[in-house]
Amino acid sequence: MDANTEHPAVGYGKLGVLLVNLGTPDGTDVTSMRRYLREFLSDRRVIEWSRLFWYPILYGIVLNTRPRKVGKAYELIWNKDLNESWLRTYTRNQAALMAEAFGGQPQVVVDWAMRYGQPSIASRIEALQKAGCERILVFPLYPQYAAATTATVNDKAFEALLKMRWQPALRTVPPYHDDPVYIDALATSINKHLATLDWEPELVLASFHGIPKSYFEKGDPYYCQCQKTARLLREKLGWPQDRLQVTFQSRFGPEEWLQPYTDATVERLAKEGVKRIAVINPGFVSDCLETLEEIAGQAAESFHHNGGEKFAHIPCLNDSPEGMAVLNHVVRRELEGWL
């Protein structure tokens, strides 16, 4: 049998790295926002309520009210030069910079995807396989593990394999909340940005995205990993506990979420006479709606409205040299045995 004529022409011998973040709408218009929110809020990992209870609320109320409101919030922080969200911009940049870092190893192919929206995880896994990747490392861009973030990325990646006759081998990246390179990068970022201020914050809030308290009670390790990140960061900075305080943001719905809440804490501190604070978001790899609009925008406004005077938002690691050092370090570690 002539292999050149009887067998399909396929690439082989390459390793894929797929960076995956949460997702982004294609635009700020109502239609784009509704499409994005429908996919996001239909995920059973995100909303664990019974579908019989949740879907009437989702389709009857949420998708008729929130798209316009959330769209206006996105408009405030939209990357107008590229007509896209900053999360898309940063994730694409991270993939491009990582590809450059592996420039001397052409067998490594780096790509990026979103859990919700485009480009989809399934489309990029298929593209990597067509590019000759027999093995793919899926990297959920979340330092701390949560079922609503890391697990749903992994779910979607393995779901993509269900439709493939010839499946690539798949690995997933574990959480790296206590990795020394990550902690060092956060400490460097804090010191670097505080040095640019002509004032010193009385304290810094480490604001993590929240999850319902019930998820934690069911065994989700997220809360513990956030606390460990903060503890290690304090130790690296040489700060006491009250100098770097943990809070949780972005609460949605009527359930109790992890506390203390960031918004309530910011308001309380201002009312208690604290005049200068800074906020960092250690759990976000890239700046996005939750950091740029909710913290740099809403939280800053609340602090000033309630008597605070100086507020600083410390940017996420994004595609900075420190941020890329973390991502490249984690990927090289997880490729061991393959590369």
UniProtKB/Swiss-Prot annotation:
One of its GO terms (biological process) is heme biosynthetic process. GO terms for molecular function: ferrochelatase activity; metal ion binding. It catalyses: heme b + 2 H(+) = protoporphyrin IX + Fe(2+). Fe cation binds at residues 209, 290. Pathway: Porphyrin-containing compound metabolism; protoheme biosynthesis; protoheme from protoporphyrin-IX: step 1/1. Its EC number is 4.98.1.1. One of its GO terms (cellular component) is cytoplasm. It is found in: Cytoplasm. Keywords: Cytoplasm, Heme biosynthesis, Iron, Lyase, Metal-binding, Porphyrin biosynthesis. CDD domains: Ferrochelatase_C (cd00419), Ferrochelatase_N (cd03411). Belongs to the ferrochelatase family. Catalyzes the ferrous insertion into protoporphyrin IX. This is Ferrochelatase.
